[in-house]
Amino acid sequence: MLTYAQAGVDDEKTSRALKSIISLAKGTFEFRRGKLGEPAEDLGHYAALMDFGDFYLAITTDGVGTKVLVAEAVGKFDTIGIDMIAMNVNDLLCVGAEPVALVDYLAVKEPDERVFEGIAQGLYEGARQAGIAIVGGETAVMPDLINGFDLAGTAIGVVEKRKVITGKKIRPGDAVIGIKSSGIHSNGLTLARKLLIPKYGLDYEYEGKKLWEWLLEPTRIYVKAVLELIENVKVHGLAHITGGGLLNLKRLTSFGFSIEMPPIEGIFRLIYENGVPLEEMFRVFNMGVGMVAVVPREEKEEALQLLNRHFESFELGKVVGEPGIRVENYGIKL
């Protein structure tokens, strides 16, 4: 049995360590008080929101994590840029913002033209899918600090104030809709790598694909689907299911969720069969659901019809009055 903390990623320890940084960061809000770009303290969750009159500028930052180690191990770099862009633009969507632009940060041990070209191809494809411009970035060559490379980015989006989605409108009875993920996306890779690679090797064949192909499958970009949803349906909440798995739903509301998740398939089944506890699976991985939308019950069918034109989507369940997340078909509560 292996947990995320045992694999080296202790979320509780990280949260405790971050408290001082978060406290000081919030203290800087006063430096923009009464000025253009004043932070909207009570609104941002997946992305911070800054006041620009009739609209908010949304901003978020994220990286690819240890997925880059798999790319390095097999020498395939042309999808990792898609992952980085996906991690950022999908977060912007969760406050109702349309992603607009991104700057990247690439830290390397030494420059390599082939690696850079592959990363650039992925960044271009990710930008194309998201409909954004890459307007700048930083490349840091640090042989004394970096072994390999790290890729991260910061993205901005815009949203009219009246269209901001915060989760405050969520009420018991609302429908919870899941949009299918492409696989593991960019979270839980440390656990997956340490559990599977030593035992099987990256070329291990599982259900018609090599292990490295399962691990490197690009994170799905939901921009077109979600923007169309927002335009046509009343959306009460949006959650990008990333680090923390289904616990991300708690970021939206104090109400609870009663849901049924899809069957455990693909890479998730392989991980589960190798000893990760069921509750830990739902706390770490997206488990086949990359994005969740919460909509009024009466708009559920229209939302499903619209989303299924882009990606396979399905009703997961409903919002309930009791706090917590109940995964009914697996008998667990988070």
Curated annotation (Swiss-Prot):
Gene Ontology molecular function: any one: ATP binding
Enzyme Commission number(s) from the entry: 6.3.3.1
Repeat among keywords: no
Pathway: Purine metabolism; IMP biosynthesis via de novo pathway; 5-amino-1-(5-phospho-D-ribosyl)imidazole from N(2)-formyl-N(1)-(5-phospho-D-ribosyl)glycinamide: step 2/2
Record-level GO BP terms: 'de novo' IMP biosynthetic process; adenine biosynthetic process; purine nucleotide biosynthetic process
Alphabetized SUPFAM superfamilies for the sequence: PurM C-terminal domain-like, PurM N-terminal domain-like
Pfam families xref list: AIRS, AIRS_C
Keyword annotations of the record: ATP-binding, Cytoplasm, Ligase, Nucleotide-binding, Purine biosynthesis
Annotated NCBIfam families: purM
Protein name: Phosphoribosylformylglycinamidine cyclo-ligase
Species in which this protein is naturally found: Thermococcus kodakarensis (strain ATCC BAA-918 / JCM 12380 / KOD1)
